[in-house]
């Protein structure tokens, strides 16, 4: 008979970006979570590049955004080199760029797990068997998944019983193969090498993001921390249809290929901490979930060329998506139908990623590409990897009202299914400015953002106070909903204690909460956030925005449509009243 200590709510397999993001989503919860990985320790130097703003916002919500940034190498421009008529490469284009190149993100995320002590982390551990017991939807406390894991050093085995399993175990996922889930797609005829090196070179743009097309092939360079540069090197000698066995490639082969492409500039390596070679695979898993109990994320469900940071950023979003949903189901006893939205939301994104990657890879391998074509491909890549164009389809957690309109009439720059943009707001109590995603910590809660307008005006203040009465009677603190007010008045014209207590809740242990009311106003040292303007909200009408724990918008309503909040949370507990829509392609 298993011990209680062998029972967990969630077992996460794999400590890469997807698995670590999923694990960090449980920090501060009472959930029993274990994370296992076959590696002996977290990677000291990450193997992914290009942290985008949307991923930084996720890390901000974990409280580690600033720490990750401290380890990053900021990049401000990308340069393109092409051969001239004489065949000699020359700089032909410079594009402003803004991206943070990663250093030790995985180490920082693991340290955050250790600090919170919510998730148990086991290294040198891999799964060897899985048994799935039959279970009905009426057994939320069941542990139907029995996983046998093995320590790689001692060969000792342990049996774990779990409610849910998340497989974030990479492109060669043990869990995906064990479940016999198809991995549709193909391996291209494009062979590339990748290496981290400390370069000794006279190439003038070595500390910028650069792409060099020459008659000998293509190389992309990305500056990193500690004097390192990441090079992506085409290994086909400029012939895109040459088949090369990646397993036969050595580090010296990579260096020789890079030298040929960068000629007449010289290139040597002071040291090479890491390198690899691969044939580009572009695949998407046929299923992202099985039985609503087992979920796959990250490279376990999508593989592609690693040249735009899209893989790591997409993997972080996968982990963030399934992490909050599992936590919400476990803590709030929500309908299991919530978990079904993971596949309907994330698989279309993965397919769009592969479709995009095919075009993006073409822009890096074509030597005859024009400046305009490369610029268009690059800008398309920026739009994709930032995630700002993603709009999730209607579901249990995205209301269909106004979904297909370009925006909501009361918030013309917001829409259900899209992510709330980050912005600066000023704390009403202490005048300290803060970015939204620094404040919106990852704690598994929905947030009702109340934009009451200019509450220094009697009409807006009265409407705001009536909303407070309604919230007190219909959505008490026990609902688990956090209410955040962002008003449009001058901060000096508002007194916190004049506001309805629903917006500054009282705790017998800690007194008033001074971190729930903010002003869209000038700060003393960091300017004005212009929140209402950026979101397209009228200070006369105001609006209510229901925000999911992952920062995407569930619902937008007027102050006269508060019943929609009741309907939303009723549905979240009982499940959808209609047949779910079939999966569709992502709206990007």
Swiss-Prot record:
Binding site for substrate: 49, 232
Top enzyme class: oxidoreductase
Binding site for FAD: 9-39, 45-50, 232, 289-299, 309-313
Induction details: Expression is positively regulated by the fumisoquins biosynthesis specific transcription factor fsqA.
SUPFAM superfamilies from the UniProt entry: FAD-linked reductases, C-terminal domain, FAD/NAD(P)-binding domain, Thioredoxin-like
Signal peptide region: none
InterPro entries hit by this protein: FAD-bd, FAD/NAD-bd_sf, Phe_hydrox_C_dim_dom, PHOX_C_sf, RIFMO-like, Thioredoxin-like_sf
GO molecular function: FAD binding; oxidoreductase activity; oxidoreductase activity, acting on paired donors, with incorporation or reduction of molecular oxygen, NAD(P)H as one donor, and incorporation of one atom of oxygen
Pathway: Secondary metabolite biosynthesis
Traits of the deletion mutant: Leads to complete abolishment of isoquinoline alkaloid production but accumulates a series of benzyl pyrroles, including fumipyrrole.
Quaternary context: Homodimer.
Function of the protein: Phenol 2-monooxygenase; part of the gene cluster that mediates the biosynthesis of the isoquinoline alkaloids fumisoquin A, fumisoquin B and fumisoquin C; as well as small amounts of fumipyrrole as a shunt metabolite. The products of the cluster lead to a brown coloration and are important for growth and conidiation. The nonribosomal peptide synthetase-like protein fsqF, which lacks a canonical condensation domain, is required for addition of a serine-derived dehydroalanine moiety to activated tyrosine but is not essential for the subsequent steps leading to isoquinoline formation.
Protein name: Phenol 2-monooxygenase fsqG
Species: Aspergillus fumigatus (strain ATCC MYA-4609 / CBS 101355 / FGSC A1100 / Af293) (Neosartorya fumigata)
Gene for this chain: fsqG
